[in-house]
């Protein structure tokens, strides 16, 4: 399951060039309403245990160990779910993105984000490693507001670092941001500010939603672009 991607190119001609580190997601689509699954998966992926895990019967862990119904994902939304479950102690949601919305509402000010490792893999895709965030997210010695602010700032910084890495190879001047996570104004505002400071022209959706509601429009535009190029 893709997500958190950076695509290079133009309509009808895109190449996937950057992403987030992947992890196995126990329960697949269930994770959208059960953020604890994403939080647990991040810990397990790093060989750690999560003290607040609500999976008392061990079924989710057993499924994760065996790979049963555990699709591999790099979805940024699931990363936000995990952060909400850990910081806000919010294991279950009434609707998708409820946890990230709560996490956004906790933030009070912009801070300097953590630097996350960014490496180019053998398949020529830059991958941002979220693992350094885990210790901070679960550190109760840091007040909840500060942790929420650090998380948002770190993801915004990671977006900017991906853009700079790709621009160094491809001379990029324009960046378009889309996807449900950019409904989060804290993330969007910080990402735009960092990208503009780095010299990019940045675009956010205005006429259409930036989330899945505009997927069909984007698919139609992509098909039209490809047909025009033929």
Task: Give, region by region, the residue ranges found by the protein language model.
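Secondary-structure transition/capping motifs at alpha-helix termini
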Residues: 9-16, 46-49, 90, 166-173, ...
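Short beta-strand-to-turn element immediately C-terminal to the catalytic PLP-Schiff-base lysine
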Residues: 7-10, 85, 223
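Conserved phosphate-binding/catalytic loops in two-lobed NTP-binding clefts
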Residues: 173-175, 185, 191-215
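Glycine-rich phosphate-binding/hydrolytic loop that grips phosphoryl groups
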Residues: 35-44, 153, 203-230
């Amino acid at each position: 399951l893709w997500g958190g991607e950076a695509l290079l190119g133009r309509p009808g001609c895109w190449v996937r060039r950057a992403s987030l580190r992947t992890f196995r997601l126990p329960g697949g689509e269930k994770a959208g309403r059960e953020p604890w699954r994403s939080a647990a998966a991040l810990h397990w992926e790093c060989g750690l245990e999560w003290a607040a895990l609500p999976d008392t019967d061990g079924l989710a862990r057993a499924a994760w160990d065996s790979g049963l119904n555990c699709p591999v994902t790099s979805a940024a939304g699931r990363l936000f779910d995990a952060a909400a479950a850990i910081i806000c102690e919010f294991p279950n949601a009434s609707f998708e993105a409820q946890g990230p919305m709560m996490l956004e509402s906790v933030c009070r000010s912009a801070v300097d984000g953590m630097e996350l490792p960014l490496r180019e893999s053998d398949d020529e895709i830059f991958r941002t490693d979220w693992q350094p965030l885990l210790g901070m997210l679960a550190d109760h010695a840091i007040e909840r507001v500060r942790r929420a602010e650090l998380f948002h700032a770190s993801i915004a910084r990671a977006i900017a670092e991906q853009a700079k890495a790709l621009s160094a190879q491809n001379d990029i001047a324009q960046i378009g941001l889309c996807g449900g996570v950019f409904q989060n104004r804290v993330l969007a505002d910080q990402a735009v500010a960092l990208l503009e400071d780095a010299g990019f022209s940045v675009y956010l959706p205005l006429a259409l939603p930036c989330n899945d509601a505009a997927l069909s429009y984007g698919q139609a535009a992509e098909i039209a672009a490809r047909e025009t190029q033929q």
